[in-house]
């Protein structure tokens, strides 16, 4: 039986099905004009110069990491062995592309209120070895980018932004995902927009954009403009140029259907975010002082991917009992992203160090969970939480 209050619901209507039929009737299924139009619309919406669509948010993280290894700009270029600071609480594929490219991960603790970086711990973790910072805006909540910029810019630290859970969030009027040199987004079913599967990388750097266009499709030059920052001027012989490989690339291309659906979803995005924020306002007003659990403190304007609940430490409650209580009440729930990822079994394969104790991340891992937010009103769900 389906839960009364699921983690995610569809935001599709007839417009998305019509878009799918439009692609089917065209007979063009692999990446083409629909994807290009989606990329242009997405870049304009978030205020970035360039957007590259891929087949998942995980692929978006892979692509943006890889691009920084091939840039000719020494201020942005990463190399194997470089140290990158990462938050202890995030999703698996925030981290795996970094280790696959040979970076050394330094895990830093999370703030119990915002669920983003503990800024004091972050500042103390930065050293002369620190080359890059991975910023994750968790569950729709922006980081304090004023502080992050003050910590990174004077030191020449490259900022990457995993914004897969936070499309539509803003800090000081600027869209999250656009603060870093590169930023990733996801359009998986449960996210703010859904293209079935999908992801996007944005950047203002033209060379990185061209590198990503090549890496996305086999490392070839076929999708590059004639005059580009990667190869200079392309040759006029399409027979040769269509099969010219210049980078060790992948196949991360999205389907044309994903681009077509994405175009329709972007038209709805303002109302989708507005609906989530209305629910978020009620969540804060009804649950901010709940005696049993703590909720996430908003920074800037969150786009409220989901609603976190952290059992208060002085109550001594069991999360397992709380989950059973939520399940009986009709809630589908899950861990806060992947919990403290530094405690995962996969860490034996990852070159890393841990800064400090990660005490907050451990607490989130053992006492935290989240329930779903949606674009439609969910007053009964929030009132049911308030009554617990």
Identify the function of each model-found stretch.
Residues 1-28, 33, 244-246, 372:
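N-terminal "arm"/small-domain region of PLP-dependent enzymes with the aminotransferase-like
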Residues 28, 32-83, 97-101, 107-109, ...:
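Phosphate-binding glycine-rich loop
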Residues 35-40, 48-51, 57-58, 120, ...:
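PLP-dependent aminotransferase class I/II
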Residues 70-163, 170:
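PLP-dependent aminotransferase-like
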Residues 85, 106, 159-160, 184, ...:
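Structural detector of well-ordered beta-strand residues that form the stable sheet scaffold
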Residues 161-195, 210, 241-244:
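Conserved active-site segment immediately N-terminal to the catalytic lysine
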Residues 185-186, 199-205, 234:
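Short beta-strand-to-turn element immediately C-terminal to the catalytic PLP-Schiff-base lysine
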Residues 195-199, 262:
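Adenylate-forming
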